[in-house]
């Protein structure tokens, strides 16, 4: 921080004022809680015929079904729509799960005598292919013959989550010049302050990155400025332990934490403006540019989930569980292909 006489000094000293302000900000505990994102009208989405949470099979193709985490699936019907309108003689139903084993007696599988399946309390590990075989008879009255018929219906069921919120933050600081090593040190110190501001929320700062530009500004000469960007996300170490203590899913909680963290950081920079005007006789060489703080919300997916509007067209924008052979280690928003021969199961955060 520059002292009397207007001499430029180190970025560490320039940040002393920020540290003092940070202490005040941390004690204030400001910030209104974030609004919970409204749940969709239907928690389950299907490609096939859709009638009040009932999905019929199709002998020609597998039906894709998307079930929100910790909710119950629609009723999966072991026949197609046209057959359901007919009289069925001596029907027998047999359901198998993704592991190829019969679902009879499984606690999470609610089976009815009419061949319907509901999956209860859906989780990512329950994703996969559910297959039903319908055996019945057709009586040819003219020939007095009975024909045994066996139809197979396949449902690909995927867990999905609502997107989490990540915030892209942009700020600007003045600098003495663009070639100084002090700029990088300043940005690293700034990151430490941001992380300490929001550490109790188990939120983290990803980045930051910066570029330095020389500007032509009226009445200011040709100053240099640091254009700094970073992301605020709710996935700092400890977030999984926090979520495990909640009774069900914690998207609403993580979204509220990310919003509060961003509000704290915004308040911190607003206090910088006040400090520069009222607490410094000499403006530091590196200081915040008033009004440069801006926030852009970015939807992201939790590790193990990703978005793919081509593969999952009927659930565009959903964070769908990563399929076997893919993984998502962070909140980047997409599932990556595993490079090795060994493949992970559904919802992988890393490759084996």
From Swiss-Prot:
Principal location: secreted
The keyword Lyase appears for this protein: no
GO CC entries: acrosomal vesicle; cell body; extracellular region; membrane; zona pellucida receptor complex
Intracellular or extracellular location(s): Secreted; Cytoplasmic vesicle, Secretory vesicle, Acrosome
InterPro entries: Ig-like_dom, Ig-like_dom_sf, Sp38-bd, ZPBP1/2_C, ZPBP1/2_N
Disulphide-bridged cysteine pairs: none
Pfam families recorded: EGF_Sp38_C, Sp38
Keyword Signal carried by entry: yes
Record keywords, A-Z: Cytoplasmic vesicle, Glycoprotein, Secreted, Signal
Gene Ontology terms: biological process: acrosome assembly; binding of sperm to zona pellucida; circadian regulation of gene expression; membrane lipid catabolic process; negative regulation of immunoglobulin production; sphingolipid metabolic process
SUPFAM superfamilies for the chain: Immunoglobulin
Glycan-bearing residues: 110, 309
Stretch forming the signal peptide: 1-28
Family note: Belongs to the zona pellucida-binding protein Sp38 family.
Summary of the function given for this chain in its UniProt record: May be implicated in the gamete interaction during fertilization.
Protein name (record): Zona pellucida-binding protein 2
Lineage: Eukaryota, Metazoa, Chordata, Craniata, Vertebrata
């Amino acid at each position: 921080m520059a002292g009397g006489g207007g001499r430029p000094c180190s970025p560490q000293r320039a940040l002393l004022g920020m540290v003092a302000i940070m202490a005040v900000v941390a004690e204030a505990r400001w910030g209104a809680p974030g609004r919970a994102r409204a749940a969709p009208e239907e928690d389950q989405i299907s490609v096939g015929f859709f009638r009040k949470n009932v999905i019929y099979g199709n002998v020609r193709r597998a039906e894709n079904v998307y079930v929100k985490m910790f909710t119950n699936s629609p009723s999966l019907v072991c026949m197609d729509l046209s057959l359901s309108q007919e009289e069925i003689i001596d029907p027998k139903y047999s359901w198998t799960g993704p592991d190829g084993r019969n679902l009879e007696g499984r606690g999470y599988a609610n089976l009815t005598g009419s061949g319907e399946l509901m999956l209860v309390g859906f989780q990512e590990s329950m994703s996969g292919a559910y297959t039903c075989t319908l055996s019945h008879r057709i009586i040819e009255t003219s020939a007095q013959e009975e024909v045994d018929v066996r139809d197979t219906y396949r449902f690909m069921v995927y867990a999905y989550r609502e997107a989490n919120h990540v915030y892209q933050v942009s700020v600007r600081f003045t600098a003495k010049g663009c070639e100084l090593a002090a700029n990088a040190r300043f940005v690293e110190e700034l990151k430490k302050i941001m992380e300490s501001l929001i550490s109790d929320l188990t939120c983290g700062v990803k980045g930051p990155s910066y570029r330095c530009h020389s500007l032509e500004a009226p009445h200011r000469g040709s100053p240099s400025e640091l254009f700094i960007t970073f992301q605020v996300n709710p996935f700092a170490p400890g977030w999984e332990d926090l979520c495990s203590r909640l009774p069900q899913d914690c998207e609403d909680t993580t979204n509220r934490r990310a919003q509060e963290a961003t509000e704290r950081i915004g308040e911190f920079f607003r206090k910088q403006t006040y400090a520069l005007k009222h607490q410094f006789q000499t403006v530091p060489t590196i200081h915040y540019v008033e009004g440069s703080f801006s926030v852009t919300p970015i939807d992201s997916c939790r590790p193990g989930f990703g978005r793919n509007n081509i593969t999952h067209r009927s659930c565009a924008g959903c964070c769908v569980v990563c399929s076997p052979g893919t993984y998502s280690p962070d909140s980047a928003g997409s599932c990556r292909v595993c490079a090795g021969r060994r493949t992970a199961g559904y919802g992988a955060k890393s490759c084996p």
